[in-house]
Amino acid sequence: MLTVDNIHSYYDKSHVLEGVSLTVNPGELVTLLGRNGAGKTTTLRSILGIICPRQGQIHFNGQPLVGQKIFEIARQGLALVPENRGIFRLLTVEENLRIAVRKTSRWQMEDVYGMFPRLKERRKNAGHALSGGE
């Protein structure tokens, strides 16, 4: 379970997130929606430790995340594919996905393909062949 409780994050002196809270239960799929500048990316960056919130708490499976290093958070299974399509262009879609799956993960490729059937259809294509929405 992921819990974000009243986080406040800044870019220098600019107070970008003001009291954001959310809970994601196991098995839930959550989407952050909002206009440009609403704080969607900053919320994700705060959860992943890219930005350290100045106030509030973030917990993943009961463990506090605020103050942990980015790689420590990633080892727990939290990651972000950046807006600039940070994938390996010459690897296939499936190879890109397999990089993200840990050996100890309960997730299997069929689980991912079940959620994103279009990726299964394109699994042998090079990563650079995907459209932005894929």
Language model feature labels by segment:
Residues L33-R35:
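The feature captures the beta-strand-to-loop junction immediately N-terminal to the Walker
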Residues G56-P64, Q76, R106-G114:
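Conserved ABC transporter NBD signature motif
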Residues V30-T31, L80:
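Short beta-strand immediately N-terminal to the Walker A/P-loop
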Residues A126-L130, E134:
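Conserved ABC ATPase signature
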Residues L48:
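Helix-to-loop junction immediately C-terminal to a conserved catalytic motif
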Residues L90-R98, R123:
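Short coil-to-helix segment of the ABC ATPase nucleotide-binding domain corresponding to the Q-loop/switch region
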Residues L2-V4, L17:
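Conserved structural motif at the start of ABC-family nucleotide-binding domains
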